[in-house]
Amino acid sequence: YTFQDENGRVVFTFPYLNDYTLIGTTEEEHKGDPNDATISTEETIYLKSIISEYFGKNLTNDDIVWHYSGVRPLIEETGKDNRQTTRDYSIEHLQYGNNTLINIWGGKLTTHRVLAEDVLKSLDYHKTWTATEPFANAVNFKHFAHGLINEYPFLDETTAKRLGKSYGKRSLDILKDCKKDKDLGKHYGNGLYEIEVKYLINHEWVKKPESVLLFRTKCGIGMTSSQIEEFQTAFEALINPQK
């Protein structure tokens, strides 16, 4: 759903990970290091208020299981505030002899593919193709998920579907040596097993436990504080086996 408050500010809500609702908005200006961006207390209160009004349920801080923030670059337009500023992007070419430098200004998640295609068009590199080609290792998800469940009956359905959706054909690389449930290694909670964590360390180069829990798998959102603490200790041992 998309909501607007009395001032016209937009708030979005999306179904998320089957059991949650993702709530968000934009237009809060951030100054400083993008890595330091985080939701403010005022923004939290604002989102709880508008969602409580539209959903007819009084949301509290206890309903918040996780939050994250990001910074989106906008192209500055004199005399316009953040709400009026274009969300479009600009591609700049600079030529240094035979070398070309391309700068991209603006852009957002929902335009990343067309932006990339525009860059390639400007280089006469390749005709557009992404609308008809699957992602690398992509599969017919419904059939593939059923295949995983049949091939590895000791996997619960939720975990099998998550692995298939997250890794596609690469989930077979994760599970290739598994013949029984013990081969999955330690279960840290919420469907996260040691064998997947080792794959992420060795093949996706994760360095921090939160990269596993909150970004790669999202399993940490449904884990208890004690499970997270235990995983953090186990992760340190996995990534630094010499210690």
Regions found by a protein language model. Name each.
Residues Y1-G24, E28-P241:
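C-terminal catalytic lobe of FAD-dependent flavoproteins
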